[in-house]
Amino acid sequence: MNRTDELRTARIDSLVTPTELAQRYPVSSSVASHVTDSRRRIEKILNGEDPRLLVVIGPCSIHDLNAAMEYATQLQAQRQKHQARLEIVMRTYFEKPRTVVGWKGLISDPDLNGSYRVNYGLELARRLLLQVNELGVPTATEFLDMVTGQFIADLISWGAIGARTTESQIHREMASALSCPVGFKNGTDGNTRIAVDAIRASRASHMFLSPDKDGQMTIYQTSGNPYGHIIMRGGKKPNYHAEDIAAACDTLHEFDLPEHLVVDFSHGNCQKQHRRQLEVCDDICQQIRNGSTAIAGIMAESFLREGTQKIISGQPLIYGQSITDPCLNWEDTEVLLEKLAAAVDSRF
């Protein structure tokens, strides 16, 4: 009889279960309290109950745990310095969506060489999240598929659904089940309506199929996530200007949704020129000083060193520099946070 299935499967490996990984790297009571408390603070900011600004900042992607921990340690000092005005959360992205092909992130390929040791990647991701949370720094990530979140979602304070997946039904269903607030990016073309539709969908109850923590395929029924919000990330042109934010708020108002959103300084808003994040910051700071209450948060890409580098076989990587999107350096990061904190002063 002719085979009709798995004709294009080149390799199958066993995967550790979320329960097994959590037993290996358990959440302490102090970390559990930290995650719970940071989620509540973020929810209050997104609801307009707290006038402070949510700041999701960090490397475009995590590839080196030592550099990530050095960044997290320095970020914790900034958290303490600006805590009266900013709720700073570290961007800890382990999965990278690709328009065509490329390195897909630490979880998929932790060795950066196409060996795809996913079990090791999941272990590194969970270990890092525990260490960063133990420092007192909340973590943020993008949820790219329906499985890997089961391994790390208990350590995440804020989640994102990316521009390429906001329109996806399964991602909207997953967001309705997540225990943290979730931001939906506008489409890569700049369309914010799909993000509003995603917010509406994620607030509803859904049923979907997914593995549970023990790897058993399960039917999940969700109660809905009331903390979905738009991330303005630009598109063919930037959409961080006051008129863009007003237009997005009009759409939110049309559907009786909270008129609070997050502005991404990178991606389409900086037109892929990382230093323009500082220009976007200046504009957003002025909008806040002018009385904007719609801007509840911002996102920015920064690391220890400026720019980006390519992975070249046989050549060592530059420590503390991105291997995906170019980032601001640490000195610019401190300036950016100082400017944001000063602008938010006007809300008090």
UniProtKB/Swiss-Prot annotation:
Molecular function as annotated in GO: 3-deoxy-7-phosphoheptulonate synthase activity
Pfam families in UniProt: DAHP_synth_1 (PF00793)
Gene transcribed to yield this protein: aroH
EC annotation from Swiss-Prot or TrEMBL: 2.5.1.54
NCBIfam families: aroFGH, PRK12755.1, PRK12756.1
Transferase as UniProt keyword: yes
Naturally occurring in which organism (per UniProt): Salmonella typhimurium (strain LT2 / SGSC1412 / ATCC 700720)
Pathways per UniProt: Metabolic intermediate biosynthesis; chorismate biosynthesis; chorismate from D-erythrose 4-phosphate and phosphoenolpyruvate: step 1/7
Single GO cellular component term: cytoplasm
Assigned protein family: Belongs to the class-I DAHP synthase family.
Functional summary from the UniProt entry: Stereospecific condensation of phosphoenolpyruvate (PEP) and D-erythrose-4-phosphate (E4P) giving rise to 3-deoxy-D-arabino-heptulosonate-7-phosphate (DAHP).
GO biological process, one term: amino acid biosynthetic process
Keywords noted in UniProt: Amino-acid biosynthesis, Aromatic amino acid biosynthesis, Transferase
Transferase as UniProt keyword: yes
Protein name according to UniProt: Phospho-2-dehydro-3-deoxyheptonate aldolase, Trp-sensitive
Catalyzed reactions: D-erythrose 4-phosphate + phosphoenolpyruvate + H2O = 7-phospho-2-dehydro-3-deoxy-D-arabino-heptonate + phosphate
